[in-house]
Amino acid sequence: MAYKIAVIPGDGVGPEVISEGRKVLDAVSEVENFEIEWREFPHGAEHYLKTGELLGEETLKEIERCDAIYFGSIGDPRVPTGVLEQGILLTLRFYFDQFVNLRPVKLFEGVPTPLAGKRPEDIDFCVVRENTEDFYVGAGGRVKLANASKQKAAKGAAGAGKGVERQVLEIKRSLYQLKFGLEIEGDADEIAYQIGVLSRKGCERVIRFAFEFARARRRSGGGGGAGEGEERERSQGQGQEQGRSRKKVTSVDKANVLTHAYGFWREIFSEIAKEYPEIETEFAFVDAVAMWFVKNPENFDVVVTPNMFGDILTDLGAMIQGGLGLAPGANINPEGVSMFEPIHGSAPKYAGKGIANPIATIWAGSLMLEQLGERKAAEIVLKAISEVLRERKVLTPDLGGSSKTSDVGDEIAKKVKAS
């Protein structure tokens, strides 16, 4: 079997950690007798600064011919915040409709956690984050009402003292296209606003994914990859110790304050939960969950949440599992091209020093193998990661070691080849 993988190393430490990920994946492909054809794309800060190009339609079509995307990191202080994120990372998520962001939160043996008294069996759950809607749809703006008021006064118009601004916002997704016509009137000098959107289908599909994921996770004793139907059940083996019997989905929102959007989310969650009577369910507000992640992480199995809350909570999850260098993410379209990445940023101050932890990227590669149906290969990689962490002989500085990025990649690849 041969797989074509689009590689976008990106910025900062991205190329360094991606290099180690490729090293390990190439090693396991030899062990398991499949081929990986890497198709590298230069898109990131350097490419943007030289060419002004982000991700165009032609490049996206080329990536679409690949089986998956292996992504490093994005972000550079020379480029205004949001340009690369919107033009590359979010473009990939939205173009390929990667509506699930799956993030395992797992403490490995040998890795210290800031949570006193918590053991690996206590920190082992997955967050399923809706990945294409909520406040990340890109609908918003800024309005200087004071300027509009002055213009009206200069013209002697009625209602001088209040500014009026008209704006049109458009949202285009695979599920829908929306257009908002806004007329803003007031005496404030300047305002900014952001619109969050949840659709019924968008909520249904990610919530149903979470329930199917919880069901398959319990059957296999784990959970970390994703597919559809039998393929999903077959390909989920990471993130849970064998023998644990919890089967629970926790819905996280803020429906007590943001009643329209998240009350809608709760309603849909309740409807879908009825289809899975064997799975325990609970509702929780996001502020409470932030506390419980720290106080009682053992109470969680599968957490499903809208986009913004998931973005925030999974960084907290990363810290309780040992840090961002150990936290992978999968952006999944079960029927299309999915993308796999570490959740850490580009960390430009560490770029070129050879000290970035590549384990999150290597683990993301394991998740990619699961998604591709190479479950045994995925398990081999995860086992090698686990052994390196347990032995604590070859670790980067963030985990108390003195090894280089490449040393960690070499050690994991060596264990893969010896499996």
What do the PLM-derived regions correspond to, one by one?
Residues 33-39, 217-221, 239-252, 276-284, ...:
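Flexible, glycine/charged-enriched surface loops at secondary-structure junctions
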Residues 47-48, 290-393:
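Glycine-rich phosphate/nucleotide-binding loop
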Residues 11-14, 67, 128, 210, ...:
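Buried hydrophobic positions in well-ordered alpha/beta secondary-structure cores of metabolic enzymes
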Residues 40-48, 257-303, 311:
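Active-site rim loops that border cofactor/substrate pockets in soluble metabolic enzymes
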Residues 6-23, 28-29, 147-150, 155-159, ...:
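Glycine-rich phosphate/diphosphate-binding loop of Rossmann-like nucleotide-binding domains
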Residues 31-57:
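N-terminal beta-loop-helix "entrance" segment that forms/cooperates
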